[in-house]
């Protein structure tokens, strides 16, 4: 078993439930409205909208890319896929929560398709890098898709195989993206929400491979 001290220093190993930080019962307070479009950040959302969680490295740049997509109703950043309830950003960065930085995407399926969002996801980052994304190193930067229903999961798995074939042609390694049913989602602190709209010159590590997902 990997020691807790090794997780803190190497940042490439996920903790076990026993090693994870305890967290807290109270949820993180977040703004009522999206900084860019003014829509509610939290449920309930209007009927007919669908949701997905995408993790593609640092969530600042990922959220901006996603809120810019036609048909996306609202976005929010947070943490998912780990063990610690209601973690703080510093706790997630320690590697001892097991969470990935993710973007909650709420979209209108009458205006965009899940397949179109998958295309944005695959092409906007490098899904072969394991527990990092570019210069951002740690388990919190791993590539993930957390789906809300069986149809989404099937589409995500099919798109992964399709994109893998294109990556192989370009000489890339195997995709490491985790695709799973949606786990609990915990909102990140208010200052992380729509960070790059509030800080236009802020850090954005988002970068793709140049490989395209076939239609």
Swiss-Prot record:
SUPFAM superfamilies found in the cross-reference section: Peptide methionine sulfoxide reductase
GO molecular function: L-methionine-(S)-S-oxide reductase activity; peptide-methionine (S)-S-oxide reductase activity
Keywords (A to Z) from UniProt: Oxidoreductase
Reactions catalysed according to its record: L-methionyl-[protein] + [thioredoxin]-disulfide + H2O = L-methionyl-(S)-S-oxide-[protein] + [thioredoxin]-dithiol; [thioredoxin]-disulfide + L-methionine + H2O = L-methionine (S)-S-oxide + [thioredoxin]-dithiol
Any one cellular-component term (Gene Ontology): cytoplasm
Highest taxon, organism lineage: Bacteria
Any one GO BP annotation for this protein: protein modification process
EC number: 1.8.4.11
Active-site feature positions: 58
Family: Belongs to the MsrA Met sulfoxide reductase family.
Function statement: Has an important function as a repair enzyme for proteins that have been inactivated by oxidation. Catalyzes the reversible oxidation-reduction of methionine sulfoxide in proteins to methionine.
PANTHER family xrefs: MITOCHONDRIAL PEPTIDE METHIONINE SULFOXIDE REDUCTASE
NCBIfam families listed in its UniProt record: msrA
Name the record gives this protein: Peptide methionine sulfoxide reductase MsrA
């Amino acid at each position: 078993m990997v020691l807790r001290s090794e997780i803190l220093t190497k940042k490439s190993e996920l903790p076990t439930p026993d090693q994870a930080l305890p967290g807290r019962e109270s949820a993180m307070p977040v703004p009522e409205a999206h900084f860019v479009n003014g829509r509610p950040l939290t449920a309930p959302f209007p009927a007919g909208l669908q949701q997905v969680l995408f993790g593609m490295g640092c969530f600042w740049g990922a959220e901006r890319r996603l809120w810019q997509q036609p048909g996306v109703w609202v976005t929010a950043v947070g943490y998912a896929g780990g063990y610690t309830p209601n973690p703080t950003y510093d706790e997630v960065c320690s590697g001892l929560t097991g969470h990935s930085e993710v973007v909650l995407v709420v979209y209108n399926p009458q205006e965009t398709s899940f397949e179109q969002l998958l295309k944005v996801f695959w092409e906007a980052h490098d899904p072969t890098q394991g527990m990092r994304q570019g210069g951002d190193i740690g388990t919190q930067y791993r590539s993930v898709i957390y789906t809300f229903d069986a149809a989404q999961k099937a589409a995500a798995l099919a798109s992964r195989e399709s994109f893998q074939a294109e990556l192989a042609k370009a000489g890339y390694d195997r995709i490491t993206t985790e695709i799973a049913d949606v786990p609990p989602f915990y909102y990140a602190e208010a200052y992380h929400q729509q960070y790059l709209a509030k800080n236009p010159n802020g850090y954005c590590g988002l970068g793709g491979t140049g490989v395209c997902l076939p239609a």
